[in-house]
Amino acid sequence: MKLTKTEQVLVFELSRYSVEKYTVTKFCQKLDINRGAFYRRNSNICDLFTSVLTLQTRRALRSVGNESMDRMFYRMLKKIKENKTFYGNLHRIAKDPPLFYRVLRKEYALAIENYMRPRGPFSVRKVELVANGIYAIIFNWVVDECRHDIRDVYQSIHLLLTHIEQTIRRAE
């Protein structure tokens, strides 16, 4: 999947090494735009981070063929592990982590709902609870610099996803 120019610059700048501070001015210089153009699209740097995270999460959780929900999330975990410096920097630099929570939790819930919708009835409340749990697991893994084995993190997410899939089995 092709990255947008904004994503390319941000991923390149934040993937090389650990960064404590990243400014709008530095981003605009690398993208070769003025700050006014940046602020027409984003309210601050955290807004930019959130939009890039949203795009990357949507791409990673897009169902491919007859792929299971477990495979979608495992694919996303692999992508996070491959770019752990980038994701770690985003969380470290962000001035508004609760915004990440609201947006990413919603994206996880939306991916689960899109997977479940053609398969039968499901509880929206249960989907939201599972999405909260998945966010907490992934957030803690990223904050810990992806030190835990990806299979352990995947197993934790799999245990949550089984609660959703049980709803389908009961309906059948």
Task: Give names to the regions the model predicted.
Residues L3-S15, E20-D32, Y39-N66, Y74-L77, ...:
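An amphipathic alpha-helix adjacent to DNA-recognition modules
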Residues T23, G88-L90, I150:
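Short, hydrophobic secondary-structure boundary micro-motifs
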Residues A94-N132, A136:
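Amphipathic alpha-helical packing segments from all-alpha helical-bundle domains
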Residues V64, Y87-L90, Y115, W141-E145, ...:
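Secondary-structure edge/capping motif, primarily at the C-terminal ends of alpha-helices
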Residues E7, Y108, V143, I164-T167, ...:
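Terminal, non-globular segments
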Residues F122-I164:
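Hydrophobic alpha-helical segments that form the core
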Residues V52, Q56, A60, A111-Y115, ...:
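Hydrophobic recognition helices of helix-based DNA-binding modules
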Residues E67-A109:
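Helical hydrophobic small-molecule/effector-binding pocket
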